[in-house]
Each structure stands twice: as structure tokens, then as C-alpha cells.
Amino acid sequence: MTIPATYAAIITAAGRGTRAGDGPPKQWRPLAGQSVLERSIAAFAGFPRVVVTLAPEDMARGVAELSGPVVLVAGGATRSDSVRAALESLEGSGVTHVLIHDGARPLVSRRVIGGVIEALQSGAPAAAPALPVTDALWRAQDGCVTATASREGLFRAQTPQGFALDAILAAHRAHPEGAADDVELAIRAGLPVTVTPGDEDNLKLTWPGDFARAERILGDAMDIRLGNGFDVHAFTTGDHVWLCGVKIPHDKALLGHSDADVGMHALTDAIYGALAQGDIGRHFPPSDPQWKGAESHIFLRHAAMLARQMGYEISNADVTLICERPKVGPHAGAMALRLSEIIGVEPDRVSVKATTSERLGFTGREEGIASIATATLVKG
């Protein structure tokens, strides 16, 4: 999931959550080692701006306990008042779109967030995740069923709900009386709202039993995989090398069946390794002439796509290049950016660095370049 630079997230956490039982407000309660609010904020890692609304009496606590690049805004008397204050804090900031999320939904996945972003990027002025109603619906009075109701066309709303900033801010200002959620205000303002896929695990913590369910989900969901990759290519005659997708002038080239991008090959194998899916040679055999001279981004894209097909998100990639020359440092930023584009993650989740072997071995004799890579995958 790539997050546009002009997108921001708003996380609402100014409510008191009295239905969740006695104790502190639910957003401050612990959930598997972190507060509910910390988990909700972490779900939006990589957003250029994250605005969190808090009750005025919680502002000092927010400053003390919430880490990361978040902006705190004092909430109002109602949820709508709080959201409007957060929206107004983004005016004139260059933000074009905003995703508004309930702070009491700490288990929202990158897949759900990505679905909203994709709809907005496709031109929808508003988009929100939801799940179709599958249970039978009844009407009841005094503890007795009085009628049934059709569930056709009914959905259970979730967050984050995404909007063009100007449009949703205008809707809030035009309807200060508020609404159940921001989609309701958007509909009143005449904005079409696209429904995107929701997730059963994206529950809103409302009742005491919801916390136990969330703990169970987290216990089942912590599927983290690490993969390592290693590759070596010898030097040959030439005037440039490809390293992590960047063409670097050099007095030699790297020898290989494809474009010999040693860094990209190591990262590709790291992803395959984390998935227990072999290596590049298994998926793109060097005996197959169609891969002669192929650009290595083809291999890396395939590995990233396979990860997503198997239900994993790439959380982090770390590549180390081992060589005396060429000097990698001046190009490391461009390399990390190129790799992030190929595997579909934020640039700050990719690291490219270099070291030497202190003139020892084949890299020390400048006979070639080696690379080591590590990839971290998390079940989405």
C-alpha cells in the first residue's frame, strides 16, 4: 500500500466509552501490551499526517504517552464537533484527502485502509469499508419479536471513512447538528459514497466482551515471518552496474543471466524465503532463455505479489551491499525509493546501506559485489 503525500488520517478518541464498563475510557485501556489508542495510531504508520482528537482533560496524557508524528487536537462536545476541529486543523496544509477512523477500532488492517485509499485515488469523493448484513433481522417490543425486516442491501459500517478534505469539511460546516458518522453527513451533502471491503476483525470495542475477542484475534494474528537472501555477481567488462534498480556509472559491469542486480536479487530471495517459496531460480530458471537479460524488477514484483496473494504484507526490507566500489552512499536514497515503489511499501520501510570486507576476499579484490537482504512479512 502506497500512501499519497497529500493524504492524512484523523483518529477520533475524545469519547468516554461508558458502555465498555468501569475503568478508564476504552481508548486508554491496555490491549495485548499497548493501549487501544496506540494500536489504532500504529495502523496508520506511514501517513504523512495523523491527527488525534482527545478530550481536553486527556491532552496532557496524550502528550506524555503517544509517540510518533501525531498532532493532538482537543475534541468538542460531540464526535462531529471533534472531527470538525480536526478537519479545520488540516486546512491550508496541502492535504487533499482524509481518512477518519474510530480510535476504538484498533485492529483495522492495512488491506482495509488500502481499499479506501484505492477508491479515493480512482476518483471517488468518498469511500468507506462495510460488511453486508448476513443475520436475520427482527423488530421487537417488550422482549417479543413483532416483525422481521429484510437485510437486502444493508451493510454494517466500519472505518476509516475517506473523503476529499474540502468536501467533508463543507459537509460538517453545513450540518453542525452532527450525525452518527461522517458518511451520513456526506450523504446529506449529496456526496456519493463508494463501499469498499470491510473486515470482520475490524471490530469497534464497545462492550466489555469486545476486549476479550480482540485479545483472541491478536493472539491468532501475530504471524510474522523473516526471510534472508544472499547473492553474488562477478565483475565483467562494461561501463555501469545496476544496484537496487538504480543505474550507476562504473568502469565495470556485473555478469549475470539477467541484469545482474545483486541487491534486488538478494531482496527477492529474502521475500521468497519468508514465504517458504524457494528462490529466484525456482520461479525464473536461468535455463529459460526468456529471462536472458531480464530486468530484475520483474522478479521482485513477482515475489511481492506472491506475498500478498498468500495474505502477507511486507513490513520492512533491509539490503546491504558489500563492495569496495562503486560507492553506494550517494545513491542509497534513490535505491530505497525504487525498491519501495516495486514492492509497494512506504520508503521509510526500506533500508539500503553498504559495507566493505576490509579488502579481504573477492569483494576486497574488487572481483565482484555481494548482497545480503532481510525481509519482514506480517499476516495482513
Swiss-Prot record:
4-CDP-2-C-methyl-D-erythritol 2-phosphate binds at residues 231-233, 257-258, 279-281, 355-358, 362, 365. InterPro entries: IspD (IPR001228), IspD/F (IPR026596), IspD/TarI (IPR034683), ISPD_synthase_CS (IPR018294), MECDP_synthase (IPR003526), MECDP_synthase_CS (IPR020555), MECDP_synthase_sf (IPR036571), Nucleotide-diphossugar_trans (IPR029044). The record marks 19, 26, 257, 356 as: Transition state stabilizer. One of its GO terms (biological process) is terpenoid biosynthetic process. CDD domains: CDP-ME_synthetase, MECDP_synthase. The keyword Nucleotide-binding does not apply. HAMAP family: IspD, IspDF, IspF. SUPFAM superfamilies: IpsF-like, Nucleotide-diphospho-sugar transferases. In the N-terminal section; belongs to the IspD/TarI cytidylyltransferase family. IspD subfamily. GO terms for molecular function: 2-C-methyl-D-erythritol 2,4-cyclodiphosphate synthase activity; 2-C-methyl-D-erythritol 4-phosphate cytidylyltransferase activity; metal ion binding. The keyword Cytoplasm does not apply. Coiled coil: none annotated. Residues 1-224 are annotated as: 2-C-methyl-D-erythritol 4-phosphate cytidylyltransferase. Keywords: Isoprene biosynthesis, Lyase, Metal-binding, Multifunctional enzyme, Nucleotidyltransferase, Transferase. Its EC number is 2.7.7.60, 4.6.1.12. A divalent metal cation binds at residues 231, 233, 265. It catalyses: 2-C-methyl-D-erythritol 4-phosphate + CTP + H(+) = 4-CDP-2-C-methyl-D-erythritol + diphosphate; 4-CDP-2-C-methyl-D-erythritol 2-phosphate = 2-C-methyl-D-erythritol 2,4-cyclic diphosphate + CMP. The lineage of its organism: Bacteria, Pseudomonadati, Pseudomonadota, Alphaproteobacteria, Rhodobacterales. This is Bifunctional enzyme IspD/IspF. Residues 225-380 are annotated as: 2-C-methyl-D-erythritol 2,4-cyclodiphosphate synthase. It comes from the Bacteria. The record marks 151, 204 as: Positions MEP for the nucleophilic attack.
